[in-house]
């Protein structure tokens, strides 16, 4: 199984220098990062495996789950534009923990232009593939950048029977006043989708020196737009391990939400993810 980005040397990614995490990261490693925090379950989101090894990744994660009790749900990779996409989905769904698919639409303008992912939203084969997910009882994890939100919102509001989870709160990267305004407007557009949740995670990818105070207003704004009933906090580990520990990451989210009710916090830290990923 080949994760191409793990083999790259001296390549700075949009989230920084990956060298410290360019190694195997299995359930025991994740458990060590969790430490004593009361994590009950986890979701594995596909992580850059070579196209031809996508099903092998799913098989491996299922074996990890069988052996260690984590991950409890798998979001697999499938290129929905390919002729064999349905056969690929059939193969993924042979494994019981598979709940959905992620095909990244946007990471960073430079990488997207190089990989061509920023053209997915205009590809009719991509939409055709998305439409088939509902009949398979599969969801879609949507990773993209703010400039792509308007086109993505138009696409996904046309196929609302497909459950969608926005990754990393839409990946805000432009922290200017105009950038924050456009990002929030895009999230409001997304929130009109009746079958969509928003995951809050990944701030370390775009702000390597983040603090509780630097992300507080962003977090609270996302919650305000989607409401606690449609929010799920995530760790984005091991990528966010580059900028903070698991305890510090979750501790920041807990501190920011300390004024919410226990029911609202249960939703954001447990129930929404449990229900969306059918754990």
Locations of regions flagged by a protein language model:
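A generic "structured core" feature
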Residues: 1, 35, 116, 124-125, ...
């Amino acid at each position: 199984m080949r994760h191409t980005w793990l083999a790259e040397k001296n390549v700075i990614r949009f989230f920084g220098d990956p060298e410290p995490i360019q190694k195997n990261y299995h359930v025991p490693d994740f458990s060590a990062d969790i430490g004593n925090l009361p994590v009950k379950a986890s979701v594995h989101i596909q992580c850059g495996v070579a196209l031809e090894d996508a099903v092998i990744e799913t098989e491996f994660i299922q074996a990890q789950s069988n052996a260690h009790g984590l991950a409890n749900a798998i979001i697999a990779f499938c290129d929905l534009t390919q002729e064999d996409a349905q056969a690929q989905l059939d193969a993924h769904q042979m494994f019981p923990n598979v709940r959905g698919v992620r095909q990244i639409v946007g990471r960073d303008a430079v990488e997207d232009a190089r990989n061509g992912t920023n053209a997915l939203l205009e590809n009719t084969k991509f939409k055709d593939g998305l439409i088939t997910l509902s009949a398979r009882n599969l969801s879609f994890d949507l990773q993209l950048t703010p400039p792509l939100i308007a086109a993505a919102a138009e696409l996904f509001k046309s196929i609302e029977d497909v459950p969608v989870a926005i990754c990393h709160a839409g990946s805000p990267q432009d922290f200017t006043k105009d950038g924050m305004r456009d990002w929030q407007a895009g999230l409001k557009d997304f929130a009109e989708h009746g079958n969509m949740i928003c995951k809050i995670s990944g701030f370390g990818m775009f702000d390597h020196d983040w603090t509780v105070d630097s992300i507080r207003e962003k977090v609270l704004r996302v919650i305000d737009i989607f409401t606690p009933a449609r929010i799920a906090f995530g760790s984005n580990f091991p990528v966010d391990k580059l900028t903070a520990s698991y305890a510090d990451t979750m501790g920041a989210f807990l501190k920011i939400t300390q004024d919410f009710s226990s029911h609202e916090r249960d939703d954001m830290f447990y129930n929404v993810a449990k229900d969306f990923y059918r754990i």
